[in-house]
Amino acid sequence: MPDTIVDIRGLRKRFGDNEVLKGIDLGVTRGEVIAIIGKSGSGKSTLLRCINGLETFQDGALTVDGEALKHHDAKAMRALRQHVGMIFQSFNLFPHLTVGRNVMLAPALVKQRAAKDGEAQARKLLERVGLAEKFNAMPDQLSGGQQQRVAIARALAMEPAVLLCDEITSALDPELVGEVLRVVESLADDGMTLLMVTHEMGFARKVSDRVVFMHAGRIHEMGSPAALFGNPQTPELKQFLSALHG
């Protein structure tokens, strides 16, 4: 039996009268890389924000690593966020802290990690994302691509079981996209469970085990990259892909 790490059943989410997720069913196996694609407003980012507890949902069930998501239980939510890392399109680094301190902060606060251990881990993670020499730099001294790589290192510092990436290259200049995608690809190669909302279709095709196409708040198609990109089954996916190439 596959080792399911994220299990989503019948998930529904409303903002007022607007239902943005209309019954999502999705199981994610440990080590799996899933790309979530679709037009703006299809519910992609909202789904990620539900998985790590940033958004509450009205109906359905969601478990991560065997633990049910319980919005009313603050302790359970803190534990969930230690299992689920999230990287946003805006890097959200603390501007007054050095790069190293940005990476060290959450483990120190949440896990009470000793400063010496935290520094060693931060240096190791910055080396992993190709920024070993930037430990003492300030965020405003970095390019957007470098800041996003620091944000990846910061998320990894909490040793998450699942990493959520929400359009993490969409705010970058085109020439900086590749350096961030190479880091994400290396995480996939190392067996990290990844769910990524992306507009980088070539990257999704190359790195993903499965691609999820969302349309109007539902999972409209799901399958291997070869199947979805090479043989789309619905008019909506065909139109979405043709618009990208048009």
Predicted regions and their residues:
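ABC family nucleotide-binding domain
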Residues: 3-225
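C-terminal boundary and immediately downstream tail of ABC-type ATPase nucleotide-binding domains
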Residues: 215-216, 222, 226-246
